[in-house]
Amino acid sequence: MIPRVTSTAQTDLTEGADPYGICAADDGALWVTLVHSGAVVRLSADGGRRDYPIGAQARPSVVTVGRDGTAWFTRTGDDRITALDRTGAMTTFELASGSGPFGICVGADGAVWFTESTGDRLGRIDPDATVSYVALPEGCFPAFVAAGADGAVWATLNHADAVVRILPSADPEVIDIPTPGAAPVGITWGGDAVWFVEIATGRIGRIGDDRLVTEFALPDPACRPHAITAGPDGCWFTEWATDRVGHIGRDGTVEEYDLPSSVSEPHGITVAPDGAVWVAAESGSVVRLG
């Protein structure tokens, strides 16, 4: 069954380019990063808004939310990870200079995982605040990271045209993508498999338990899919270059939806507890598809 989008609602956050990452919390709130002005915004389910400025130099990028409601986000500009709890208190972890943290997720055990895109490492922050690292192939440029159902985490290796699977007790398992120049970016666990986007070739990829990669070509190979997230009946993804949102079913069926004409450069995407799809558009707004 393909979900049907019957309406869109746009909420303007900034006058200029800004919204980038977005994540829905269990309480219905949305967390949004403003990558250029340097802030994180919480939009509550009742329409309230609270801004947490951290400085334009921080370039907050991707955000995730833990089971306790704490929002974690990467600061690509100043090489930090920050946790923002329900009270508004911030805890910041300083990383190696020039490491370029980008993707972030919460694992099944509550640990926080993040990518260091220019450091070629995956980092892990344990609940006791211990930080450890997993080295990845040199020059691979890890991008997004997602938690699987078996305790593993998966990350896209943008410059290596590959996906890596990590278990805390095992060596990294690198899985090559068949299409050269795929440049994978977004990745998510889709309930039965790992799904990822190939921004340079306009494809969606799937990796099952057998580690086989299946690729699905999108109608426009130049649409530049960027982020992807799981929903009840498949996955939703953004098409950065065409100002659209797409849905792919588990059988590979693709449906695409145009965003409002005033919206451009969709990046982050999330599915809220009520099933609504939310998109962060760098043009200055978040958009709800329902």
Swiss-Prot record:
The keyword Nucleotidyltransferase does not apply. InterPro entries: Streptogrm_lyase (IPR011217), Vgb (IPR051344), WD40/YVTN_repeat-like_dom_sf (IPR015943). Its cofactor is Mg(2+). The active site is at H267. It comes from the Bacteria. One of its GO terms (molecular function) is magnesium ion binding. Pfam families: Vgb_lyase. Gene3D superfamilies: YVTN repeat-like/Quinoprotein amine dehydrogenase. Its EC number is 4.2.99.-. Substrate binds at H226. GO terms for biological process: antibiotic catabolic process; response to antibiotic. Keywords: Antibiotic resistance, Lyase, Magnesium, Metal-binding. The keyword Membrane does not apply. Mg(2+) binds at E265, E282. Belongs to the Vgb family. Monomer. Inactivates the type B streptogramin antibiotics by linearizing the lactone ring at the ester linkage, generating a free phenylglycine carboxylate and converting the threonyl moiety into 2-amino-butenoic acid. This is Virginiamycin B lyase. It comes from Mycolicibacterium vanbaalenii (strain DSM 7251 / JCM 13017 / BCRC 16820 / KCTC 9966 / NRRL B-24157 / PYR-1) (Mycobacterium vanbaalenii).
